[in-house]
Amino acid sequence: MKPIDREILRIALPAVVANITVPLLGLIDMSIAGHLGDAAFIGAMSVGATMFNLVYWNFGFLRMGTSGLTAQAYGRGDTSEAISVLLRACSLATAIALAIVMLQYPLQWLALKVISPSSEVLHLAQRYFFVVVWGAPAILAMMAIKGWFLGMQDSQSAMRISICVDVVNVIASLVAVFVLRMGFMGIATGTLVAEYVALAYSVHLLYKKHGTALRQASIAQALRGGNMRGFMSVNADIFVRSFCLMLVTLAFISVGARSGNLTLAVNSLIMQLFILFSYSMDGIAFAGEALVGRYEGANDREQLRCTVKRLFVWGSAVMVVYCIAYGGLPEVIFSLLTSDADVVSAAVSYRLWCVAIPIASMAAFVWDGVFIGQTRTRGMLLAVVTASAAFFVICFASPYPEGNNRLWTAFITYLAMRSAVQTWLYMRRG
């Protein structure tokens, strides 16, 4: 195996492991809610999680922007600047978190307007939100810290933080619900406790590995006007990009919901296949962020180009595996996700769309990692804006016959456009 392949796997595999823990945690929390004796608890758990996804989704730049800038500083051997990036990211995370806490009432109102749950679920979801929202400082700070570790070529520390929050969440929720008899609110309390325990663990890792550099750092220097403006410019592009991604996702769900419960269920299952593919591809993208950023910072163009080629080799291998699985075993996969024979049968009829997902999106995932590493965030924004425009035109203004196939045509085109535009931008500049 080539040295660059070992480097890619060294960073990618811990990231994939960390990603896998996310749905497992959701399943365990859902299982705890399911044992409380009322279906409304399950609904409230789902709605509460969705509310925070809507709130936090747009702040993914705290991880991505931090990762790229840190990797470049690492490549230059500039430890002082790498620490300064961390301080800027954590300062911005704290400011955003305080704003979320102060604006929690209008935020929960807006999120519930978008989701529109039943009155019983709404009341429980509100109670869940008003407890877990106090974890915003911990959640956003950990986004920045995990991005920083990734930029420092240390995805294992980022993985440990993710596993820590998941394990503590499960233990704390079980204790709060079944030992302390807190009921549904025990799940929210367990989540809140886990977030701050994981934040403490994150700080412990930072000082254990980089304590000397952190103690010598100057917050005033890190936050000086010119330095902060460059940091904010990178993150502003990613913020707008994330907002566009959220709009497409919400539109996809909304349009699918109008076609009836069966279509909504089918789309949800197929979207799980996209999410499953993304768990693997995110690992390769994270490796791209770290390694491309490192070689960009070191101004090593030859090694950078070699890294990009190998990222696409690994991405293509993952794509082929998923295409074979989705094309050859759709009934088996869908049967694992639901026992409803009608839903499985309907979902299998969309086999070609399932296969198209990895083909259309593979390059987009890889390019995202490359562009973040190079901090070419304006190019990422251009790709997503163009792709989003294509999605909305096909979905709402095309002569293509209405129905679920038009929706999937729009979504696959959106993924393919992201891949195509970023390919063009990279080839133009190299």
Where in this protein do the model-derived segments appear?
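Short alpha-helical transmembrane segments in multi-pass integral membrane proteins
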Residues: M1-A12, T70-P137, V168-I171, V177-F239, ...
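Helix-terminus/linker motif at the lipid-water interface of multi-pass membrane proteins
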Residues: L24-G43, L112-S119, V175-M182, F239, ...
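Small-residue-enriched core segments of transmembrane alpha-helices in multipass membrane transport
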Residues: S162-N169, Q272-L273, V385-I394
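Small-residue-rich hydrophobic transmembrane alpha-helices
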Residues: I42-M102, I139-A158, V266-I324, G328, ...
